Amino acid sequence: MAATELRGVVGPGPAAIAAPGGGGAGPPVVGGGGGGRGDAGPGSGAASGTVAAAAAGGQGPGAGGVAAAAGPAPTPPAGGSGSSGTGGSGSAREGWLFKWTNYIKGYQRRWFVLSNGLLSYYRSKAEMRHTCRGTINLATANITVEDSCNFIISNGGAQTYHLKASSEVERQRWVTALELAKAKAVKMLAESDESGDEESVSQTDKTELQNTLRTLSSKVEDLSTCNDLIAKHGTALQRSLSELESLKLPAESNEKIKQVNERATLFRITSNAMINACRDFLVLAQTHSKKWQKSLQYERDQRIRLEETLEQLAKQHNHLERAFRGATVLPAHTSGSAGSGKDQCCSGKGDMSDEDDENEFFDAPEIITMPENLGHKRTGSNISGASSDISLDEQYKHQLEETKKEKRTRIPYKPNYSLNLWSIMKNCIGKELSKIPMPVNFNEPLSMLQRLTEDLEYHELLDRAAKCENSLEQLCYVAAFTVSSYSTTVFRTSKPFNPLLGETFELDRLEENGYRSLCEQVSHHPPAAAHHAESKNGWTLRQEIKITSKFRGKYLSIMPLGTIHCIFHATGHHYTWKKVTTTVHNIIVGKLWIDQSGEIDIVNHKTGDKCNLKFVPYSYFSRDVARKVTGEVTDPSGKVHFALLGTWDEKMDCFKVQPVSGENGGDARQRGHEAEESRVMLWKRNPLPKNAENMYYFSELALTLNAWEGGTAPTDSRLRPDQRLMENGRWDEANAEKQRLEEKQRLSRKKREAEAMKATEDGTPYDPYKALWFERKKDPVTKELTHIYRGEYWECKEKQDWNSCPDIF
C-alpha cells in the first residue's frame, strides 16, 4: 500500500499514531483535531491517542491527542452589568440586564438567557440550575424600543418585561438577537398559515415523515459502509506492516520496524473498538427502525379506520336528519325573519334545528354537492338561469362605474361549487385555523379588515351617545353598539380573507354619515389588524384585534384578542371593552349555526361607570330566548341604574331600575324591578337586502365594502385580485391567484428573516417590520402595547402620494 494511501487510512501521518507516553497524566482526549483525510473518519489520531492512553495504564493522550488539545478551549465571555454574551448549552444569548420590578425597588439586575425562542431570567447566574423567575415565549411577543437603553417585551398583557441595558450598543445587540430568535420561533410555531407560508398540513406531515425515514435509512447505510471500510483498511495496514517486517534490513532498522508494528497494533485496537461500536449502533438502529416502522404503520391504519368510521357516522347523521324532517309536520322556523323575543322563545330549539332546510354539511365518498333550495348554505346557493340578467363581466364593469354617492345594492350571486370537504377538514382538528391554507370555497369576498369595519354599521348609536349628558345613559348606547356588531354574524358562516401584511382598507363616509375609517394589517405572526375611525359627530373608535381560532372537530372556536376604545370628544369619556368568543357549530355534520358566548365589561375610565354584558350560550335544553344578552349599568359604587335585555341578532332594550324600599326604609334588593313603562329600545337590526341568501347574507353596508373606489391606497383590500375574482364567481382563478399572493408574501418574509440574520451576524442594527399608518406604543389608559393611528393617511390620499406603500398584490 502506498504511503499516501496509508496516511489516508490512518490519519495525518506518523504523529497521529505516535507511541504512548509522550503526554503527561491527564484525561484522555475523546475528540478534537488531527482528523484523518481519508475514509477513516474524523480524527483517527485522536482516537489512537485515546486507546494508547488506556493501554498504557491511564497515561496522557498520545501525540495526536496532544495535538488536538493543544489549543486553548474557547470560553464564552461573561456578561457584566448590563452586558451580554453568547452563552453555552445551546443558548443564543445570555447576560445581565436591568429589569423593572416595582416603584419601590425600581430596576434590578437580573441574569437573562435567550434560548430556543424563550427569554428567561434569574436573579443570578447560579440560579439557572434550580429557579427560573420568569419566561416569555418570543413567538407571540412584541419587542419595542423605548429609548437608547430601554426596551419592552410583551405578549399582549399577561407578561410584560421593561428592560434596560448598560449602553445603546448592548441594547441593540439584545434587540437584534431577540428579533432573530422571534423570527425563528415563529417559523417553527407556524409552519403553515392561510396567507401562504407553507403547504397544507397533510402534505407537510407526509413530506416530513418521508424525509425522516430517508435520513435514517441513509445514516444506517453510512454506518454499514464505515464498518466495512474500517475492517478493510485495518486488515490492509496489518498486512503491509507484516510484509515490511519480513524484509532483510540493517539491524538498526529492526528496532524502528518493531516500533511501527507496535503502533499498528494500537491502531488495530482502535479500529476494533470503532468496528464494535459501529456494529452495535448498526444493530440498535436497525432494531429501532423496524419498531418505528411497525408503530408508524399501526398509527396509519388506526387513522384510516377512524376516518372511515367518522365518514360513516356523518352519513348516518345526515340520513337521520332527513328522516326527522320527513316525519315532522311542523313548519320550519326561519331565523332570518325578524321576530319578537316572545316568538324566538317559543321556537326554542327550532331556531337551531330547523332554520335552514336542506343545509347539509356532511362528507360524501367523492364530493359534496350543495342542495338547490335557497337557505343558509355553506358553499353557496344555486343560481338559476333567470336569476341574473347580466354576466359576471358586465356586473364587474358596472360596479367599477359606480360612484361614491350611488352605493351598490347587489353583488354577483354566489356560485354552486362542489368541494371535497372532508379531505381538508380532517387535518385541521386541534389546529390554529388561520395557519392552514384553505381554498376560497370557504371564504366570503371580504377581508378581515372589511369585516372589522362592519362594526360601524350602527354608528348612529355612537352619534346618539355623544349627545347624552348623563354618562350612565351614554354607557347604555355604547353597550348597544357593542352588541350590534354581532348582528350580522348569525348568518355569516363563511370566513373572511386573511389580510396580507401591510394590507389596508379605508371607508370614507364623512359626507354621508359623518365618519371615516382606516384598517391596516400590522402583524402577520400573530395576525393582527389595527382599526381607527373618527366622526365629526364627536367620537373616535380604535382597536387592535388578533384573531385566534381552533378547530375541535365538531365546532370551531374563534377568540378575538385585543381591547376596543371609544372616546367622546366633548366629555372626554373613554370606554374600553373586549369581544366575546364566537363558536361555529356542526362543522362536519349537520347544519352550520353560530353562537356568541361570554361576558363583556365596558368601563368608563373617566367616571368609573361600568356595564357588564352576558352573552348566554345556546342550549338545546334551555327554554330561554335564543341568543339572549343581559346587562347591568352600574355607577362607581356598584349601584345598578339600568338593566339591558335583548338578543345579539335582533335588538336591545333598556330599563331604568326602580329600587324597592324594604321594611327599614332601605333597598330591599339592589336591582329592584324592571318597570315596563321605562323600556326604551336602544337598537334594532336592519333587515337584510333582498336575495341576501344568494349574496353571502351580506348586509347593506357589507355589499358596498368591496365596491371599487378610485384614489385608494394601492394596498387597499378592494384591489386584492383573488378576492375580486372570487366575488365575480371565478373561484378557480381566485384559488390560483391566492397561491401567487401566498408565494409572494412567503418570499418577502424569508427576505426579512435573512436580513435579520445577517444583521445579527454582522452586529449591525436591524429595523423590524413596522406598520405604515399605525405606531406601536403604550396605551395611556390600559397601559397595553397597541397600535395607534399615527395620522397622514388622509393627507396622502388627498395628494395621491402613495410612494411609501409596499407592493403586496
Swiss-Prot record:
InterPro entries per record: OSBP_sf, Oxysterol-bd, Oxysterol-bd_CS, PH-like_dom_sf, PH_domain
Binding site for 25-hydroxycholesterol: 316
Residue numbers spanned by region Disordered: 17-49, 63-91, 332-355, 729-761
Residue ranges annotated as motif FFAT: 360-366
Binding site for 7beta-hydroxycholesterol: 316
Gene Ontology cellular component terms for the protein in this record: cytosol; endoplasmic reticulum membrane; Golgi membrane; perinuclear endoplasmic reticulum; perinuclear region of cytoplasm; plasma membrane; trans-Golgi network
GO MF: cholesterol binding; phosphatidylinositol-4-phosphate binding; sterol transfer activity
A Pfam family the protein falls into: Oxysterol_BP
Positions carrying Phosphoserine: 192, 195, 200, 240, 242, 340, 347, 353, 381, 384, 387-388, 391
Binding positions (cholesterol): 316
Bias-annotated ranges (Gly residues): 20-46, 79-90
Function of the molecule: Lipid transporter involved in lipid countertransport between the Golgi complex and membranes of the endoplasmic reticulum: specifically exchanges sterol with phosphatidylinositol 4-phosphate (PI4P), delivering sterol to the Golgi in exchange for PI4P, which is degraded by the SAC1/SACM1L phosphatase in the endoplasmic reticulum. Binds cholesterol and a range of oxysterols including 25-hydroxycholesterol. Cholesterol binding promotes the formation of a complex with PP2A and a tyrosine phosphatase which dephosphorylates ERK1/2, whereas 25-hydroxycholesterol causes its disassembly.
Domain writeup: The PH and the Ala/Gly-rich domains control cholesterol binding without affecting 25-hydroxycholesterol binding.
Protein name (Swiss-Prot/TrEMBL): Oxysterol-binding protein 1
Source species of the chain: Oryctolagus cuniculus (Rabbit)
